[in-house]
Amino acid sequence: MRVKRAVHAKKKRKKFLKEAKGYRGALSRRYKLAKQMYIRSKWYSYVGRKIKKRDMRKLWITRINIAARNEGLKYSEFIHGLKLAGVSINRKMLSELAVNDPEAFKEYVRIAKEALAS
């Protein structure tokens, strides 16, 4: 018996063309190109999720560095001082404090300075 695939093939093509809606030019109209771009877009989103983590950490460190330098410490000295003092707070929280609650951040800077001095 002959196997007819028309329904399944059309369904498969339609799925990729639906996902590729909004792509520019032939990328949203031609099945082969739409499929390639769909696969590539999924790869970009996967890689983007990994890069986002790096970028956020860089942003936190930059914010902490600026706030610490305003108080007279470099970022590396500040982090080292916190470790010597036994304070375990992550960079995300330090960044939030630096932006939203400068007084609390100054307290952490004071703790780090005391630990470095002793």
From Swiss-Prot:
Cellular component (GO) terms are:
ribonucleoprotein complex; ribosome
Annotated Gene3D superfamilies = 6.10.160.10, Ribosomal protein L20
> Record's SUPFAM superfamilies?
Ribosomal protein L20 (SSF74731)
The alphabetized UniProt keywords are: Ribonucleoprotein, Ribosomal protein, RNA-binding, rRNA-binding
Matching Pfam families, A to Z?
Answer: Ribosomal_L20
* GO molecular function terms noted in the UniProt entry: rRNA binding; structural constituent of ribosome
**Regions crossing the membrane:** none
Q: Which CDD domains match?
A: Ribosomal_L20
Q: What is this protein called?
A: Large ribosomal subunit protein bL20
Q: What does this protein do?
A: Binds directly to 23S ribosomal RNA and is necessary for the in vitro assembly process of the 50S ribosomal subunit. It is not involved in the protein synthesizing functions of that subunit.
